[in-house]
Amino acid sequence: MPIGVPKVPFRSPGEGDTSWVDIYNRLYRERLFFLGQEVDTEISNQLISLMIYLSIEKDTKDLYLFINSPGGWVISGMAIYDTMQFVRPDVQTIGMGLAASIASFILVGGAITKRIAFPHARVMIHQPASSFYEAQTGEFILEAEELLKIRETITRVYVQRTGKPIWVVSEDMERDVFMSATEAQAHGIVDLVAVQ
């Protein structure tokens, strides 16, 4: 039996009456938001609009992005990453469960010194993939060139944000590399592992 989205009480500052709002609405008001699904344009646009709105509302208070995602669309994930770099408040990233593929890219995009992984979190990095095997030859070549450009961009970001040499990052991206929270910390993807 599904429970739906829980409702929690909320009282706006200066108001006497308490209203019931869904839990995500309440957490957004506290500047906490979640990437708990595959990354696509819909969730990307929702997170981007939240970050922009909350940074306009108050540009000195940190934002907190909790990540438990298998990854998803590369361009949508890169849009989230770019927004995190653009907004004035620091975006703290918290990896919990799984941060794989483009979700690990978003995780590494948090403010330096403010990237955290829960103790049992898993992180996975790899090279971007495509389904160009279904395309005709001309499209195949164009898509392969675009994929190579995206891979170079992602590699540069990992190098910049982890402090690892380009050859280490490039080698790791050749295949699926799964890491524990402490391994992700040693790799420079997160700065801290939350204490159990």
Swiss-Prot record:
One of its GO terms (molecular function) is ATP-dependent peptidase activity. Pfam families: CLP_protease. Keywords: Chloroplast, Hydrolase, Plastid, Protease, Serine protease. It catalyses: Hydrolysis of proteins to small peptides in the presence of ATP and magnesium. alpha-casein is the usual test substrate. In the absence of ATP, only oligopeptides shorter than five residues are hydrolyzed (such as succinyl-Leu-Tyr-|-NHMec, and Leu-Tyr-Leu-|-Tyr-Trp, in which cleavage of the -Tyr-|-Leu- and -Tyr-|-Trp bonds also occurs). The active site is at S101, H126. Signal peptide: none annotated. Its EC number is 3.4.21.92. GO terms for biological process: protein quality control for misfolded or incompletely synthesized proteins. GO terms for cellular component: chloroplast stroma; endopeptidase Clp complex. It comes from the Eukaryota. Its main location: plastid. It is found in: Plastid, Chloroplast stroma. The keyword Chloroplast applies. Cleaves peptides in various proteins in a process that requires ATP hydrolysis. Has a chymotrypsin-like activity. Plays a major role in the degradation of misfolded proteins. Component of the chloroplastic Clp protease core complex. Belongs to the peptidase S14 family. This is ATP-dependent Clp protease proteolytic subunit. It comes from Arabis hirsuta. The gene is clpP.
